[in-house]
Amino acid sequence: VDRLLGVAGKEDIFIVTNASQTEVMLSQTAGRVRKDHILAEPAARNTAACIGYAAVTIVKKYGDGIMCVVPSDPYIREEAVFQDTLREAVKAAEETDALVTIGIKPSFPSTGYGYIRSVEAEGKPYRRVEEFVEKPDEETAKAYLEAGCYAWNSGMFIWKASTILSYYKKLLPDIYDCLMQLAESFGTPREEEALWEIYPRIPKISVDYGIMERADHVLMLTGDFGWSDVGGWDAFDTLKDRDENQNLTVGKTLLLDSRNCTAYSVDKLIAAVGVSDLIIVQAGEAVLVCPQSEAQRVKEIVEALSEKGENSYL
């Protein structure tokens, strides 16, 4: 929220979160985000649903406007540079009516991010997107880095709210129909009831797969502001150095005869002996253990817990 307050006022910031997190979100953002701008999802339905929910809320309740979709988990080292890049993206969306994204200038051949291939737009600060590509293997990632025309997909998107809804109507009609049903209830006594009735029926698909990979007019601003997607535990390597045994530790930890492990403790002791290549995370009543090579699969655990209604562990 704080990094966005440098670009937008608190009257213009919306947060989409799971309904189980609403009270925590209200407490953490008090005085910085309007209470009625915290939109609670009754169920996790992937990014096309939550972004569409925010877009239809903006259009139906407040009229059209430029919408910036910014995930909450990335670490951004140079916030002033990020804000300048976001302003450029807003300007591009206003002038072109395109879908705009921010691609991160890659600093190493990551296999944990999707990539965006783009070409120059002569005389413009943005580039024209030619293709979104899946997370590559190591050799392909090295080739992308050497090619110079690939960027990491940050998941940040900028567009007119009405423009993105027109793409929902064209490319994701089932989701669009659900959003229109929700919109009909806005401002009525049935608004909350309709949300809980309709939202869980929205098809689960990401906005990347559903729209961005299929849209015909996508532009990209290149971001070079110290971005790291700490939604993945392997990204901690970009934030802190490993010790002489290649272990990375945060919090109360004790690793004996162990190598190449990541141990992160919030408030309890993590102790391990004779292990290697593991990620061990403790937070509250939950403990995560997985091989370093499987770090990108943590989201599968999140999805499984969400489907079982175990949101208290998330």
Model-derived segments and their meaning:
Residues 1-71, 75-87, 293, 313:
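Conserved N-terminal catalytic core of the sugar/cofactor nucleotidyltransferase
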Residues 10-11, 34-35, 62-65, 95-99, ...:
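Short coil/turn connectors at secondary-structure junctions
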Residues 14, 67, 156-157, 228, ...:
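A residue-level structural signature of the nucleotidyltransferase/glycosyltransferase Rossmann-like core
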Residues 16, 68-71, 101-105, 133, ...:
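Short beta-strand segments
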Residues 38, 99-101, 220:
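Conserved beta-strand scaffold positions in the cores of enzyme catalytic domains, especially
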Residues 54, 73, 116, 160, ...:
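Residue-level signal for inorganic ion chemistry
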Residues 79-198, 292:
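Conserved core of the sugar-phosphate nucleotidyltransferase
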Residues 162-314:
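Left-handed beta-helix
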